[in-house]
Regions:
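Short acidic/polar hinge/loop motifs at secondary-structure boundaries
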Residues: 66, 84-113
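Outer-membrane beta-barrel pore domains and translocons
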Residues: 10, 111-113, 130, 143-149, ...
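Periplasmic-side early beta-strands and strand-to-turn transitions of outer-membrane beta-barrels
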Residues: 145, 168-194
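Extracytoplasmic beta-strand/coil segments of soluble accessory domains associated
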Residues: 45-84
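Short, acidic, small-residue-rich periplasmic hinge/interaction motif at the N-terminus
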Residues: 1-37, 73
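Structural signature of outer-membrane beta-barrel domains
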Residues: 12-14, 73, 85, 147-149, ...
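Outer-envelope beta-barrel architecture signal
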Residues: 76, 136-140, 170-174
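N-terminal periplasmic accessory domains that precede
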Residues: 44-47, 64-67, 79, 95-98, ...
Length: 194
């Protein structure tokens, strides 16, 4: 005998992302965590390559730098919640996107046209990463992934854990996220010197 089956889903993030994209005055792509979670992307660099108009530069097999509209990566700006992210390298503006775990981001906003309310230092466009907010109900999420790098002949491991809750009559919200990525890289490299 067939029992009742109830299937539920939460697409609020995707609905908000589509509304934000539709109501934008400029050319803007918004991708929610719902969409990012459909793919096995361990970092933001991997998630960005799925957005139209975005290209990523690879370094040692990792999607490291984001390019907007075909311009160089240092002609685009990267912000987290609207605050500028500095480069880990001292001589360039490129932001290493492979260092930012995808589990910690709620929404990716890609502005392909700089508007008057934005800094005028991003010729290609800007990438804004919006972090997760604390939910109104307890939220626990764990992810795990593994792989094998044939060049370095070593195993890869990706782990993620996210916890969110509100306390004291919803006056204090907490969102904790931890991520571990062990990706032993290796490359077959040939460089020519002229």
């Amino acid at each position: 005998e067939l029992q009742e089956v109830v299937v539920g889903g939460a697409f609020q993030g995707q609905r908000r992302a589509i509304n934000s994209q539709k109501n934008s005055l400029g050319i803007k792509n918004v991708v929610s965590a719902d969409q990012v979670g459909k793919f096995p992307d361990s970092n933001i660099g991997d998630a960005l390559k799925r957005i139209s108009g975005i290209n990523v530069q690879y370094d040692q097999g990792e999607a490291r730098f984001g390019q907007v509209r075909g311009t160089s990566a240092d002609m685009s700006s990267v912000t987290i919640n609207g605050n500028r992210v500095p480069s880990a390298e001292g001589d360039t503006r490129n932001v290493q996107l492979d260092l930012i775990p995808a589990d910690m981001i709620q929404t990716i906003e890609v502005n392909k046209v700089v508007t008057p309310d934005m800094d005028a230092d991003a010729i290609g466009g800007s990438i804004n990463l919006v972090t997760k907010n604390s939910p109104y109900k307890r939220f626990i999420s764990a992810t795990a992934g593994t792989g094998y790098n044939w060049i370095s002949d070593k195993a890869q491991l990706n782990l993620g854990f996210t916890y969110g809750d509100r306390f004291f009559n919803d006056k204090l919200g907490v969102m904790l996220s931890a991520s571990y990525q062990n990706s032993p890289s290796g490359s077959d490299d040939v460089e020519f010197v002229w």
